[in-house]
Amino acid sequence: MDQGAMETLPEKPSEDEFSLALRNGLILCNVLNKVNPGSVLKVVENPITPAIQYADGAAQSAIQYFENMRNFLKAVEDMQLLTFGASDLEKGGSSNKVVDCILCLKGFYEWKQAGGVGVWRYGGTVRIVSFNRKGSSPPQYGIGSESTTDESVSLDESESSQYDQLLDFLHLSNEISAEESETAISLAFLFDHFALQLLHGYLKESDGINDMPLNEMVIDTLLNRVVKDFSAILVSQGAQLGSFLRKILKCDNGDLSRSEFLAAVFRYLQHRKDLVSKEFSKFCKCGGKLEFSRLNAREFSPGHVEAIGLQQKELEEVKSNFVETRSQVKQMQSEWQKELQRIVHHVKAMEVTSSSYHKVLEENRLLYNEVQDLKGTIRVYCRVRPFFQEQKDMQSTVDYIGENGNIIINNPFKQEKDARKIFSFNKVFGQTVSQEQIYIDTQPVIRSVLDGFNVCIFAYGQTGSGKTYTMSGPDLMTETTWGVNYRALRDLFQLSNARTHVVTYEIGVQMIEIYNEQVRDLLVSDGSSRRLDIRNNSQLNGLNVPDANLIPVSNTRDVLDLMRIGQKNRAVGATALNERSSRSHSVLTVHVQGKELASGSILRGCLHLVDLAGSERVEKSEAVGERLKEAQHINKSLSALGDVIYALAQKSSHVPYRNSKLTQVLQDSLGGQAKTLMFVHINPEVNAVGETISTLKFAQRVASIELGAARSNKETGEIRDLKDEISSLKSAMEKKEAELEQLRSGSIRNTTECQRARAVSPFHLPRTGNGAGTKAEASPQPNDGTRSYETRSCSTGKQRKSGFPSALRNREASPRMPNLAEERLNPSPSRRSLSTDRASTIKSRNKPDVTQNLPVSRTPFPARVPVVKSFSTVPLNPSAENNHRLHTDNSSEAFQNHQKLSARKLFPEIEEEHIRHALHIRQGGVKKTRAESSKAKAKQPSPARFQKLDVGISLRSDADSEAKVGNYQTQKGNNNHNVIHSRFQNFDVGISLFSDLCAGDKSDSTLKSDSSETDNEPPSKSKNAQRNSSKNSLNHKLRTIYAHEDTSLVDDKPSNGTAHIKEGNNNISMPEFRRSRSTHHARFMVP
């Protein structure tokens, strides 16, 4: 209460510090003036700080000290409050009195602040109540103090201190304080009632006396009399109570203990309460004593008395009813309290259940989305457009929207069952849903683009249903109205920036529109409308429209600028249904490419955000002219989209994607391994209920489509290596195909010569150097005068095409076989075509650049090393020196050289075939149709044909072999004759069989080559595969025959592979037919 005390006194002062601060009286005077203003008129100001610094107070002035303390003690004494002496503030003084005085000031101040109602009594220390003696005025306060007057009753200083110490242990409760206040009120009420009744009696007695006026003096005199009488009653009652207490103390049993005394006092109070409570309550409530009421009742008539009695009875009944009603109300309150507690517990249980239900519902939603991802089902979200400001009072066709994705449409134009239709989708958004809530449900799907998935989100619905509002938003300047397009790009930027330390992303944007079945680029600044082409499955990075501008973006500001340009360039027009109707399909494509920093893997994702133009009825939209043409194209493209959806829902083998540009753009999203989501928008107006129901039916068909689990476009390092290998193999294959085309033209010329030279069998040719059919001038003659022939199958160019793979030609021209140079030092022999029914010679073609065409010296039995690219002669009558030299060669060395060359030719060919087969599988080779399979089967020779050929071949071979081998039977033993005879017989059969098959295939293939080729697949692949299979089977049979004969003649053959028969001076060399293992064709050598 005093600012000086707050500054000088510490927070928790000691007793000496407290006494020292109050010694000058300045703080006490200031506090008293705040408690009772004007109590101390003159306060002597003096510095406080020096007084506190010195404990003996040497800095204080004696005059100031005594003047402030004297004024404070005098004012407190006048207020009849507790006081103390000046010596109590000195060292060794009693600080209890000082504290009691200050607490008494505090209690008095709080009583005044509360309004000063009733009599204030200090309950903290001893209270000495004193009354004035005879003739004195009553006290102003209910608190006695140490008074120096003669009329007051005071206690000694020692007695006061004794009682102070005694009452320090007494603590009155709040209930006793409340009872004391009630007693004071009751006494005041009794005093007022006593005084007023006395005044009433006086005025009534002096009513007829005029000499007794009514003035202030009369009232003062009357009140003084009342006070005296009331004081006398109180004094008398105090004397009675004192005598009763003294009587209790002076009992026969001796001194009572404190507990016994308190028990006796309590019993007395209870007895007095029981005696006077009833009368006192009646007196207080009814307004006076019963005697006074009885006296007044005499003045009323009997009717009034009876009425008062009835009223009294009614009042009693009302009281009883009130008591009963109050008890009932209390009982009902208790019941209601119990019911309220039960409801509270039930609500809490419901809250727990509801929270667990929502938790389970959220888990079910997440699991459902995972199942949908695994199935690849198109997710369908339905959004109901809110009414416009002027349409708020219109009837809505949406009857109910459920939390589980159900929506009920009420058709007012139908009755009973047909009036209500239920549709179920993944989720349904009502009219009050914000743009942010729409995007939250689509956010997980959009974010999967950064993981390498392809995502497509498109909006479908009739015109004016809010598709553009959902996808783009009405205003790009207001964040609350941003559509899915901008929110998706902003979210992708935020997420890509958060993953910078793991993956680096590059984001590009394309924006096109399909207007009147023409694809146009919206991100152009010059307003040009260049026509763009759609290329499905041509680009691995999702660029279906590669000619459109792909603009890289790095922040949201770039996206806003691009979207403004796109919306500005988009075709928009006004119709009767919508003032700003989109007249084209808009496609915003976001291309994302990321690279993992740890593994180096490439992630490619593509996000298509499609805003479809709304379907409309021409009679409602009132479209004419250009608007009519736009509406027709829009409806046609949406109809094509419906056909595609129906085909996908029915799992049809053919899906008509190419019926519209729109379906071509959405082909990868609807039919590929992508995550697809569709927003279906409906108009709640009654006049649009038909379009609403048809739109929801279309959405239900879309929801039933299962595209299969989406796959991430993640390219690891191994995949990139394999792709590089595939590209290199493709380039090598293209190079070999070009070489194959060059070889095909040469094969056609060789086929013509082969057909012209099928007249004479090689066994019947004259054994001279210049036969009729040999055409020796076409090939150079060797130095030793010998001439060689080559047996060659007569097949068509197309048949020969599959037998000359490009890889084989490259290997023949490459210097990878150095052993061939040592084995081919002799002049190259000429080759001859051989057939079973007719024979002819073919002009040989010399290729000096090829290593295989080097000249080879003639031996009686040529080695099994075919020379593919040249024709030369083989000597029929070798010289004796040559025969003698070849006879002395080591046969085992020739056999080893033959095996080396055969293996060197065979294994690269198998490797090439494996490579071509693997490439064919990786590229997803052409699948043969049934017609092509039947044609391939027809080309294979039947078993009956083989039987006929075997018969003819065996007869011819027997005749020829007997004529040729008969000359040798006289020169050699039977053993050699049997071996050679069996070898020629077996080889003759194989060669004849192979030649006839080749001739038959040639004629068949020549007639059917044009008719069997289709536009959709290459004409040569299936045919070559069939010819190769038949040739391989035949080659296998010939190799079996040759291997059987080769085991019996290994010991008798010279090094060059010629079977030499010698008797006497005559040397005769027998021809040997062998198949080359270097190509698919059956080629044999005839010496």
From Swiss-Prot:
Its main location: cytoplasm. It is found in: Cytoplasm, Cytoskeleton; Mitochondrion. Residues 744-754, 780-797, 836-856, 1017-1033 have a biased composition (Polar residues). The keyword ATP-binding applies. Residues 710-749 form a coiled coil. Residues 1-110 form the Calponin-homology (CH) domain. Disruption phenotype: No visible phenotype under normal growth conditions. Residues 377-705 form the Kinesin motor domain. Disulfide bonds: none annotated. It holds the Pfam family CH. Residues 136-155, 740-858, 923-949, 1004-1087 are annotated as: Disordered. Induction: Down-regulated by salicylic acid (SA). Residues 1076-1087 have a biased composition (Basic residues). ATP binds at residues 461-468. GO terms for biological process: aerobic respiration; microtubule-based movement; seed germination. Residues 1042-1054 have a biased composition (Basic and acidic residues). The keyword ATP-binding applies. Required for keeping the ATP levels stable and balancing the aerobic respiration pathways during seed germination at low temperature. Belongs to the TRAFAC class myosin-kinesin ATPase superfamily. Kinesin family. KIN-14 subfamily. This is Kinesin-like protein KIN-14F. The lineage of its organism: Eukaryota, Viridiplantae, Streptophyta, Embryophyta, Tracheophyta.
